[in-house]
Amino acid sequence: MSQRIENTFEKLRRENRAALIPFIMGYDPDATTTAALLDALPAAGADLIEIGIPFSEPMADGPVIQAAGLRALAAGATLHSILGLVRQFRAKHADTPIILMGYFNPLYRYGNERFCTDAAAAGVDGIIIVDLPPEEEGELKPYLDASGLKLIRLIAPTSGAERVKLLSQSASGFVYYISITGITGAKAAQTDTLKTQIDHLRQSTDLPIAVGFGIKTAEQVKTVSAFSDAVVVGSALVDVIARNKNEAVKAASAFVSELAKGLKR
């Protein structure tokens, strides 16, 4: 079973810095570009990579990521084809963890056991399922455990103490703290209150804590990385890819490299 997530965070602890986790939508704008982006991101500064699974009803996604999902679906994205891109990536990149992020419906239609088996075989390390609360994970959890896939939990600022405890106990790999309320990319994260929230969350979990939603600039990455274990940048990167369609890989690599400069503690 893969230990890439644990090994990556342990390495970064020794280097005294947080991880940079860029998010891209699988198949946005097409398979060839996604494969090239995945290939380029580690050298640009990505420590882990999140790949979005496009879905036709993405309730937590803002307009930037919704549009990316629609482009991906129009390009022929399926869960099976995205796993193929991960397999292709893993043939060249043995150590960079890959996290899939999406909604439960595509996984359910694929088949819970089949998904976990195929994802682990392709080289996926963890999964974030936006709409699967701990109370409903029962049918999926045995297959996740058997395959070694980590179930990364989202924790919101609105989560009460008991909810945070339940989510933390259900999580593996790391936990993902949502820095703002609302949909992805809707507004900028308010870093002045984030540190207090993260310090409080550490009382409930020993897992690394990633912070995402609303982080758009290198300055924000620098600020948030000082008190978190990882920083996720999604909508801002997806927007760069959309605005630089013909040079998406070059533009995305430059943007990620700029973000990575702020990660030294």
Give a label for each model feature.
Residues 45, 119-125, 144-152, 169-175, ...:
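Glycine-enriched alpha-helix->loop->beta-strand junction motifs that scaffold or abut catalytic
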Residues 149-185:
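Histidine/lysine/aspartate-rich catalytic loop segments that bind and position anionic ligands
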Residues 2-12, 31, 56-67, 77-89, ...:
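Active-site-adjacent beta->alpha loops and helix N-cap segments on the catalytic face
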Residues 46-56, 124-128, 133, 177-185, ...:
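Glycine-rich phosphate-binding active-site loops on the catalytic face of alpha/beta enzymes
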Residues 20-24, 49-51, 98-102, 127-129, ...:
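Hydrophobic faces of well-ordered beta-strands that scaffold small-molecule active sites
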Residues 22, 41, 49-52, 119, ...:
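Conserved, mostly hydrophobic/aromatic
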Residues 199-207, 216-265:
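Alpha/beta catalytic cores of nucleotide-metabolism and tRNA/nucleoside-modifying enzymes
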Residues 31-42, 159-168, 211, 215-231:
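Catalytic cores of alpha/beta
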